[in-house]
Amino acid sequence: MTSRGDSREKILHTASRLFQLQGYHATGLNQIVKESGAPKGSLYHFFPNGKEELAIEAVTYTGKIVEHLIQQSMDESSDPVEAIQLFIKKTASQFDNTESIKGIPVGLLASETALISEPLRTVCMKVFKSWEAVFARKLMENGFAEEEANQLGTLINSMIEGGIMLSLTNKDKTPLLLIAEQIPVLVRKKG
């Protein structure tokens, strides 16, 4: 028998994946329950406020995973240019096999719901800012002033999000690789 925690985790994981692939409006609660294998009543037990509550938790869940992946790349090199390029190249590698593309972590849901759901817009904004902060911390550790590092963090994340959108649309990682190539121009070394 599936434990309550397992059912919640399955629902959350499945919802996160489907929102990334299909977006908010194309993902139905019945599909989430069916694909998660969780008991039907468990969705409303764990997410009594329905789809919006589930989407908010799914964005938070996905956001933490991506933040961890960014931090891993930042930890792999002391050079911020190399670390940022590494993360972008790892992200680009998802597009090596177009049949296994996982979708857009938060961008699709954010663009689809920002004007209709303030709670979803807010959680997406917080997730984006958490990713930007990882880049900014790396830059500050390497001599960048806080304001400049924060601006660059936002710019880098914006470029990556746009690169993911273009790579997904083109089924080709070239846009992300072009961004990685331009990071040295954008992030001029201090010292």
UniProtKB/Swiss-Prot annotation:
GO MF annotations in UniProt: DNA binding
Keyword annotations: DNA-binding, Repressor, Transcription, Transcription regulation
Keyword Transcription attributed: yes
InterPro entries reported in the protein's UniProt record: Homeodomain-like_sf (IPR009057), HTH_TetR (IPR001647), Tet_transcr_reg_TetR-rel_C_sf (IPR036271), YxaF_TetR_C (IPR054156)
Residue ranges of every copy of the HTH tetR-type domain listed in the record: 5-65
Cystine residue pairs: none
Record flagged with keyword Membrane: no
Recorded superkingdom: Bacteria
DNA-binding region positions on the chain: 28-47
Record's protein name: Uncharacterized HTH-type transcriptional regulator YxaF
Organism: Bacillus subtilis (strain 168)
